């Protein structure tokens, strides 16, 4: 819903399309392939949810629970993304603390040869970007990863 509002407010209607889907459900039959897939999936390990700050605990459990190790959604998305992306597309994830290397490795196993992990302003690994080697984003990601 927020992405659609942003498309409208930035006057990108007609140039940008958005789709919302359940990443753990069966893959939807989308028309065409995506240039960009961005995901901020639930990434908190199930056992850690009870110990979260009260304000975070008020969030719907589906927005928090990433499974036993917090990586369930990343496994599914990295497996399915190559089937739904253009050859030189870009995959971007927000990640939880200490998940950067695991998510980066999943991207590599899925065939993304250019992978970069970026830190937030507090110095915590927060984003993973992935693209096919030789694609239009590959050189940029390799530069970011340095």
Task: Tell what function each PLM region has.
Residues 45-47, 100, 137:
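Short glycine-rich, flexible loops that bind phosphorylated cofactors or substrates
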Residues 1-53:
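Conserved SAM/SAH cofactor-binding pocket of Class I
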Residues 43-72:
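Mobile active-site "lid"/loop adjacent to the S-adenosyl-L-methionine
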Residues 131-146:
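Flexible, glycine-/basic-rich loop-and-beta segments that form/coincide
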Residues 51, 62, 69, 83, ...:
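Class I S-adenosyl-L-methionine
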Residues 68-132:
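Conserved Class I SAM-dependent methyltransferase catalytic core
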């Amino acid at each position: 819903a927020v992405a659609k509002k942003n498309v409208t407010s930035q006057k990108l209607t007609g140039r940008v399309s958005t789709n919302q889907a359940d990443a753990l459900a069966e893959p939807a039959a989308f028309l065409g392939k995506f240039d960009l897939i961005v995901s901020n999936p639930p990434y908190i390990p199930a056992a850690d949810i009870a110990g979260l700050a009260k304000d975070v605990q008020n969030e719907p459990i589906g927005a928090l629970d990433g499974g036993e190790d917090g990586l369930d959604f990343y496994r599914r998305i990295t497996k399915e993304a190559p089937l739904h992306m253009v050859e030189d597309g870009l995959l971007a994830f927000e990640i939880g603390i200490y998940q950067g290397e695991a998510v980066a490795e999943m991207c590599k196993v899925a065939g993304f040869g250019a992978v970069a992990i970026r830190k937030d302003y507090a110095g915590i690994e927060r984003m993973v970007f992935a693209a096919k080697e030789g694609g239009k984003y590959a050189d940029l990601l390799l530069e970011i990863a340095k």
